[in-house]
Amino acid sequence: MGIEKLSDFVYSKTKRNKSLNKGGPTIMKKKKLIPCIIAIVAIVLLGIAGVKLYQLMFGGAVKVQTADIISAIAQMKLQLIIGAVILIAGIVILIIGLRKKDENLKDLLKVQGIVAMVLAVVITVNTVCFGPQYSNLSTVLSGTTAISEEHINESLEAAEAIADEGITLLKNEGNALPLASGTKLNVFGWSSVAPVYGGAGSGSSDSSKAASLLDGLHEAGFETNTELENFYTNFRSERPSISFFGVDFTIPEPTMEEYQNANIFENAKAFSDTALVVIGRSSGEGSDLAMNLSDDNNFTIGENGEHVTFSTQEDDLDAEKSYLELSNREIAMLDEVTKDFKDVIVVINSAQPMELGWLDQYDNIKGAIYCPSPGQVGFRSLGKILSGEVNPSGHLVDTFVYDLHAIPTINNSGSFHYTDYEDVTGSADNIVPFVNYNEGIYVGYKFYETAAAEGLIDYDEVVQYPFGYGLSYTSFDAEIADTQDDGQKITLTVNVKNTGDVAGKYVPQIYFNPPYTDGGIEKATANLIVYEKTELLEPGESEAVTFEIAYEDMASYDSDKIKSADGAYVLEAGDYQINLCSDSHHVLDTYTATVDTDRIYDDAHEGKRSSDDQTATNHLDYAKGNVTYLSRAGHFANYGESIAGPTDFTMPEEAKEIYASVVTFDASKYDDADAQMPTTGANNGLKFQDMAGVDYDDEKWDSLLDQLTIDELKELAGNGTFHVVATSSINLPYIYETDGPTAVNSFFTGKFGTAFPAPIMVASTWSKELAGRFGTCIGNELCDFGFTGWYGPGMNIHRNAFSGRNFEYYSEDGYLSGCVAVAEIAAVRKLGIIPYMKHFVLNDSETDRARGICTWSTEQAIREIYLKPFEMAIKEADANGIMNSKNSIGSRWIGSNADVQNTIVRGEWGFKGIIGTDSLDAVSEYYENQNEAVRAGTDKMLCMSYGDDYWADESAGTVIALRNAAHHILYALSNSDAVDVHTGLPVWVYKFIAVDSIIVILLAIWEVFTIREYLAKKKENAEA
């Protein structure tokens, strides 16, 4: 149809409409509704676009508060106002058109009004997408969409290998395991049909393709009772959620009446005399686990406003029980199962240590297996272990005790608030939380081994399974065969022999017991210092394992200045027992090393340790606060006093001054008053790609940094939510980043990688080789998806069993955590990935973390336990990324703590890389001062809503701080695959332009037709 014919068609249709209008007022009234309907449609379209943007940008990657949405809208207000003005103009034009008596002019104005409203939507969406939300959309619509088939297969093989060696055999009475091939199994426990594959939050993974627990049993050749499976599935199909989106501690399990009404036990006995019982517990980001299943069943946590349910099964409510004990319904089920079946095997499917004393209270429980968060294919490994195809070689990464309500940290875990600080500017609820790390260095096994040695506890009455414990289907002998000692380094050769009948792997563990003076530097009697895992040893086969131990690695940190003027690492004179162990408690062989005189690693004595760039001295005295810490002095004489819960809820005055740093921040404390404004916006002709391999201190960096404008410096630092922004002056491409520690987990983009076993399972392998293999596999998946930054690994400490994200972290031990992290990080670094190891530091629980919880601890404990894995990763794996945490050291937010980030991390350890924040949101901005943070060593802000007003003061001090941050960011990127990233516009931009072009062309054609029609009719009327 030609333009003339199309114009004639439109004209004839208009004439027809005119004649219809003469038919009466009803038709005219309906026609007047048309522009209103169109206006409503335009508004709806604009709303849909807004909702879609919200879903894309805030689709679950981080916790989004209402205030974040308000803040994001505030950033878009100019674009929204412009769109609203055009929309209103369109409506006004429509109304004016309707009032015109000239039908020709009326038709023209109606079209103009409609076009204006369409343009309002188009312009608003475009100005928002290419303006304040450009970086977020670039993140949402980033990269490729698939992992290569080769890498998928490699990942699945690695995941299964990790589970093969991470699942831990706890009990095997009378060699009840492995089970005979083809054994019929009654699988009891609701968790058998809804097992725990992983955790919730940033460390979650996609388990939609996972092999179920029952799948794993079937693949291993077992036949299971389908009546039981159907019974549990019909009872409940989904596991209750524990995350920051909602908390339900219900432990699903049918009542005994329901079992009996369905004749479950009678029918099961007819099926088989063997029972497998599955006990599962879940956990996730945003909530610690319930220490009491309170009778007050429902309440709301103030921090995120989520609803908490202790149990929807009222008969399970028990204020004396925790979530990590058997529920009343589970006990009833076990009573019946152990009465009816002679061979009962238990699977513990929980990332947290549970109270398991009941395993020894039922005579018919012959075996027990610990299987924490096995991921996508890990339950296949469980089946293989039960059948004997795989010999278990996992070892515990936490101490399992009989009574979790008696652990030293129990009274100082949870939510405690200061009562005398009522003016927290910006805080919605005026709550200032705190937690006391009262146990000092005596965390996990270090307490139990030392307390037993000092006579405080009867070890066997308190500890059920030691740290490092794990059984095998075979037996091993291990002994120290040779030692070489030059006074600086000890070399041990350990011979391991398989003395059983089945091939297996063994983990020789070396702990040292240092000399201790009563009232002196605090020391534990057992400290893991090296370990290895053997190859698969056939029956009768031996392997010699060599270990090297540096003397300085046995030094303790003297934060109380007992032997050093300013605090230092001190290797005291005396005998050091170097113990070969099967776990933290059972010593197999010993070598004694003697140090003749104290070695004090400060500038006045030995100088710095060989691994340090600068001498370590006290920088965190204020973190100690007014807390009484557990001491070994007098055989733990202050045990009762130190482990009691807080009694003083008044906040120290000096702590108050620091806490609300947005109010108290003073740039003059950081800035040189005589500092000169750096050069910005220079034209030096350098590109980011030119900096690949250039040394951090090379003067060439100054030339590149001089090219950045102040606005670019601000955006590099401030706009860092799952990306690094493209920067035109240096040709820096857009860099994509993603979660998480267990799997590629991009809620923003909807891209999910292989669901590996959780980090706790990786650590439970005690295999550095497998940890490195995990790093390689997740690194390959990150590369396939186009991500350069990885928000992992998670390296916090299992301070106690109730911490919600223990699945996401490795262990209660800093050294073991460090070894796993080193292997993973070294592997991903080889692939050009920047790992943001997190959450730095003392973020060992979820309760109140988003309120900047004040964390009080000794500097000795901070250095020896909580900083240890980060230190190891920087020194041994050249880690070049850190994600700091939302909590505070003392009362100073980590992100604003220059003592830790600049002095210790960059100074002592020589770190040269990016330090980014955990999510910054509008709720917590009253203590997360980004102006101070960038001066204190934080380089990049994970802001839910970016605004450059954080650095409205463009003083020399501010620009210098932003320039330093840019240097850190760009240096890390120059040593990553970012140097090879495509520098053109993102693909989504071209798609957007194409859609815009189509809309504009269609509108233009419509305008041409409309104007031609108007002019033709006007001419016709004039001639008439």
Name each model feature, range by range.
Residues 586-609:
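Short beta-strand elements
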Residues 1-579, 583-586, 606-1024:
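Glycoside hydrolase catalytic-domain context in secreted enzymes
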